[in-house]
């Protein structure tokens, strides 16, 4: 599809009032279900304890490369000048002292610092997996390698970017009046650009889920806008009201820093929830919606798709599944895939595609019924895509399951107790 057609498609979607209202409701439900404010509070506390070990890793990486040694102080100043409130700037001195006393740390102390950092990173991954409705976490070794890669490469890229920026702005072009104005504008824009790029990378790398760039970008944009609003509001409050300084005195930096980290996490998580909602939302007309309680119908259709894919020696990715089964929502699909993986009926390959792990010819329906805990609906309701081959097979199996239940469940509840002895006097 060409870009012009895509833009036209998005324009038509925005004009569709029913779709827009449906997405708004869906987004609001996701915000409430994700409990982002509680998650941000938890991450804020763990982040405070991880600041020192994080700084140790970051500056340890820079120390390993002599070319970056001269940029350590510049990187620290850039972070604290642009991303930390002025009232909490004294934390930078405490952090520098901790780094200077690094050689005095005992083995137990270093283990505790590294453990606090790993706990924080694990909590962040769990929170993002929860937002993207991912039940299965990465293997521990893979998780550690990703953490280490992000920290080391991110640090090196940050230092290299600052070195490159310093080189570019030292060119004769930026010594003119116009060039100096452009350089000043670029430096003012740099913090927001850094925030935006980092948040996009976080959304794409941290969750155990394939996050499309077209979904990560709007989420990151929302997060950056919220962070800039928070930054402005924070500066206005601290500049006009001295309550924290009067109450806490010299210790005011700690609650201010904690509140700042909390509000920053709220911004990042709200952006993540938007990105997740954009990838999960599917507008379904009334005729294409799966009736409540008929999840087993969707499960049987899904297994039929996997059986057909196996015949052709192929697997199915999540986008393909949603395209083939339009009655499945992203949330229901994730739940079904996780359940089938848990009972080892499906597996995921290195490309992110789902494959059958066992032959369906030897899997009894009882195993699906017991393990997936899906009800067998008694009433007959219109089902989407019932007339195709997969719908006919799933509907026939569903009819066989509920046929003997109808007569049993039609009897009055009182008939169950007709053979009991009379009530005692």
UniProtKB/Swiss-Prot annotation:
It is a multi-pass membrane protein. GO terms for cellular component: plasma membrane. Pfam families: Virul_fac_BrkB. It is found in: Cell inner membrane. InterPro entries: UPF0761_bac, Virul_fac_BrkB. The chain crosses the membrane at residues 48-68, 105-125, 154-174, 182-202, 216-236, 250-270. It comes from the Bacteria. Keywords: Cell inner membrane, Cell membrane, Membrane, Transmembrane, Transmembrane helix. Belongs to the UPF0761 family. PANTHER family: INNER MEMBRANE PROTEIN YHJD, UPF0761 MEMBRANE PROTEIN YIHY. NCBIfam families: PRK04214.1, yihY_not_rbn. This is UPF0761 membrane protein XCV0968. It comes from Xanthomonas euvesicatoria pv. vesicatoria (strain 85-10). The lineage of its organism: Bacteria, Pseudomonadati, Pseudomonadota, Gammaproteobacteria, Lysobacterales.
């Amino acid at each position: 599809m060409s870009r012009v057609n895509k833009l036209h498609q998005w324009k038509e979607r925005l004009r569709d009032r029913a779709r827009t209202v449906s997405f708004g409701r869906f987004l609001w439900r996701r915000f409430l279900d994700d409990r982002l404010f509680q998650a941000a509070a938890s991450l804020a506390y763990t982040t405070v304890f991880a600041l020192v070990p994080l700084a140790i890793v970051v500056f340890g990486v820079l120390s390993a490369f002599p070319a970056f040694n001269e940029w350590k102080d510049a990187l620290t100043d850039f972070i604290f000048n642009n991303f930390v409130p002025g009232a909490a700037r004294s934390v930078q001195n405490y952090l520098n002292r901790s780094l200077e006393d690094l050689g005095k740390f005992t083995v137990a102390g270093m283990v505790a610092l590294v453990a606090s950092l790993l706990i924080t990173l694990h909590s962040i991954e769990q929170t993002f997996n929860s937002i993207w409705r991912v039940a299965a976490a990465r293997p521990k070794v893979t998780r550690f390698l990703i953490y280490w890669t992000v920290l080391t490469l991110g640090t090196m890229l940050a230092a290299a970017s600052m070195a490159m920026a310093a080189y570019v702005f030292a060119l004769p072009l930026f010594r003119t009046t116009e060039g100096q104005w452009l350089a000043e504008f670029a430096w003012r824009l740099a913090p927001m650009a850094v925030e935006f790029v980092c948040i996009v990378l976080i959304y794409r790398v941290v969750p155990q889920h394939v996050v499309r760039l077209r979904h990560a970008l709007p989420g990151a944009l929302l997060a950056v806008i919220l962070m800039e609003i928070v930054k402005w509001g924070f500066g206005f409050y601290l500049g006009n009201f001295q309550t924290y300084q009067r109450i806490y005195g010299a210790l005011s930096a700690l609650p201010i820093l904690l509140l700042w980290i909390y509000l920053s996490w709220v911004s990042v998580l709200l952006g993540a929830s938007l990105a997740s909602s954009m990838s999960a939302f599917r507008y379904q007309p009334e005729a294409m919606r799966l009736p409540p309680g008929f999840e087993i119908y969707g499960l049987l259709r899904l297994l039929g798709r996997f059986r057909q894919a196996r015949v052709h020696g192929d697997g199915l990715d999540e986008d393909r599944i949603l395209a083939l089964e339009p009655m499945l929502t992203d949330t229901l699909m994730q739940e079904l895939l996780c359940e089938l993986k848990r009972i080892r009926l499906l597996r995921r390959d290195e490309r992110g595609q789902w494959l059958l792990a066992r032959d369906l010819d030897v899997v009894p329906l009882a195993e699906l019924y017991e393990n997936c805990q899906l009800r067998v609906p008694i009433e007959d309701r219109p089902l989407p895509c019932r007339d195709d081959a997969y719908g006919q097979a799933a509907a026939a199996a569903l009819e066989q399951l509920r046929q003997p239940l109808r007569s049993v469940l039609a009897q009055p509840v009182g008939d169950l107790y007709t053979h009991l002895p009379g009530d005692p006097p």
